[in-house]
Every structure is written in structure tokens, then in C-alpha cells.
Amino acid sequence: MKKIIISLLLLLALAIWGYTYKKDEMRDLGMGAIVDQTDKVVDKTSDYVDDVTDYLGDATKDISKEAKRIHKDVVETVKEGAAEAETATKKAMAKVTNRKLELPARLKHTPERIVEHTGFTLSFNREHNNPNWAAWELTADEAKGTLPRANDFEPDPKLPENHQVTHADYTRSGYDRGHMVPAADMKWDSKAMNDCFYMSNICPQTHALNAGGWETLESACRRWAKQEGSVYIVCGPVYKGNKHKTIGKDLKITVPEGFFKVVLSMREGKEKAIGFYYANSNAKQTMEQTATTVDEIEALTGMDFFINIDDHLEERIESSFSLKQWR
């Protein structure tokens, strides 16, 4: 609009200039009255042009001021929005960080008592007097721990006395006191080391498994923690059929038919998960033989793992596995 007005004013100025240049010739031709009348119009028009020019100058200044004010408001709004977005992002990240990615869903049809210990969480089953599962995050720094092994098996004081398994319940049973959370994973903290020797973290395992394939897998998990930055681990017993062997003196402790372990890495861009099932037997078992998908372990146990990660990511990494990706 401003450009149009300026263009019209220029045309009008040119017309006035042309008239001024030719008006003497018009007087000589007997057009003096017309010239006098036109002079009055030109004078008024010139005044209008000056007024409009002044107005446009003031308006331009006002527009410039308004534009600067609007720009300032927009910049401040954008900054405020960016600050709010950053705050919201930090809160969201804090929420994700605070979630324990290793924890499975609560069990619906199995007795469980959730027990928190230093470095790990477990779900205890009062019918089997074993953990349903034990879960923990193992970081690269924790996997490098150097504390000595505690080796003092104790009843778990966080359980009711009538379900506190003792060291004696395993004596001469023919089974090892098999750690679910291994002592070597807890060498980063003395309290964590002591807590993992509570009998609530123990299941009856054959010596061949405890000192063989299971121990090999435990060592691999520590290596993966150093490699990936951290891993999330869940493991526990597997029961098959309705009849099970039991051990124990004061308490009846069910001997599982097997054991599962699932491992998750959330290394950005290389997220992956893998599952393992080991029979509780004297047979030699390798990771190549026992590796499977997390989905298969979920079908075997009835548990739902890694529920706190994105659903699409969970579906993708739980439905397939590659042991080579973990080497």
C-alpha cells in the first residue's frame, strides 16, 4: 500500500512540474484565467503532497517502532517457549531415567512379595520359597568392582519369619545355593554384596549348572555391561508340570526344572535384547544352545519383561535375537 501511494505522489509531482513548465505558454495563448485557477489547485495539491509525505514519514517511523516491538515480543515468546520445552524435556528424561527398566510387570496368578535390596529387586514366592525373579541394572563401572566375595548366606530379614529360608535348608541337599543376582555383579558395594547373599536370592541348582553354563552366562553379562555401558538383567526359576522335587529342613523349597535370564541393552541406536533358558541338569549347556528371544522366555514363564520401554521398541527387540550382536 505504501509503495502505491508513493508512486501516485511521484506521478502527481511530475504532473505539477510539467504544468509549471508550460503555464507561461498557456498565458500567451489567452488561458490566463485557467492558469490562475490551476495555480490554486496546484498550491493546494502541493500542500496535500507535503502533508501526505510528512504523514508517511511519521507512519513509517511508527511502523518501524511497532515492527521492532512485535519482533521483541516474538523473540521473548520463542525464548519462553524454548525454555518451557527444555524444562518439559528435562522432566520427561528424568521420569524415564527414574523408571527401573529392568523390572517386569507384576505377576497376576503367582504369589509374589516385592523386596528391594541394595543393587537389585526381587519377587519372592512363598509357595516355592524361591524368588520368582531377580532384576538389576549392571553398569560398566559396577562390572569393574573389586570387593571380595562375602560368602555369608543369611535369611532375608525383609521376609516373614515363616518364609525365611536358611543356609541349613540346603545342607546335604545335593544342590548348590545358586545365586540369581551373582556376587560378582555386586563387587561395587559392600552392602550390595552382603544383600545378594540373602537366601531370598538363592535357588537350588545342580553344581554342573551353577559352576558351568550359568556361570559362563554371568561372566558374559559383565562383559556386555562394560561393552554396552550398562545392561538390564532379569533371571529366575522355571517350573514345569505340577509335581516338583523339594529340599529343605524347616521349609519346603521347590527345585526348579530350569532357569531363565533375559538381558537388555539400551545403547542408543543399538538397542537389543536376548533371552536364555538353561535346564537344571548335569548336562553341559552352551550359550549358543540356550539363547532365544525374550518373547520365548515370556511364553515359557508367563512374565512380561521390559515393560517400561517404548512399546514399538519392545516388540522389535523382544521378537528376535542375535548372539553375534553381543559378542
In which residue ranges do the predicted regions lie?
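Domain-level detector for secreted/extracellular nuclease and nuclease-toxin modules, and
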Residues: 2-327
